[in-house]
Amino acid sequence: MRPISSSPDTRVAGKARSYMVLAGILAVVLLALAWPRLRAALVYLPVNAAVERYYLDGKPPLAALQALQQRARQSAALHSHQEYWSGLALLHHLDAVYGEHPLAAQREAYEQSLAAADRALALAPVDPRTWLLRALAQNWLSFRDAGVVDSFAMSV
């Protein structure tokens, strides 16, 4: 006579339980691996909404510009992604154009915009909006080489 623990129903239940445990472990591992990217995306959500609103209606989010820059910087630090750097470049550009700053602070904002645009383009060089931001910053900073023309050409 067979022991009760080796009946077919018990073996099937044991296999099902082991598959459930394996699936649970796999889910935890995948969540742990995806957590930095997920956290960066959650931090970047308000920035993404503000950038999309700006492109739709043309009104810059001046009241929240510093907070949005901080969120974009934090997202890029958590997970370096082209969209985060491109959004940061746009926010610095808007700060330079619409901010009430002396010329030195305006120049610094354009330099930060150019640096963020360069980081974004290093990750994904096919974004015309970022090329245009780069060209505008280079033009304002009085770059006299062919780089400005090349940046404008890449934005078209």
Which residues are covered by each model-predicted region?
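N-terminal Lys/Arg-rich, disordered targeting/topogenic segments
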Residues: 1-13
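Hydrophobic/aromatic packing residues within the alpha-helices of TPR/SEL1-like helical repeat arrays
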Residues: 69-72, 117, 152
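Extracytoplasmic/periplasmic/luminal assembly and interaction segments
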Residues: 62-112
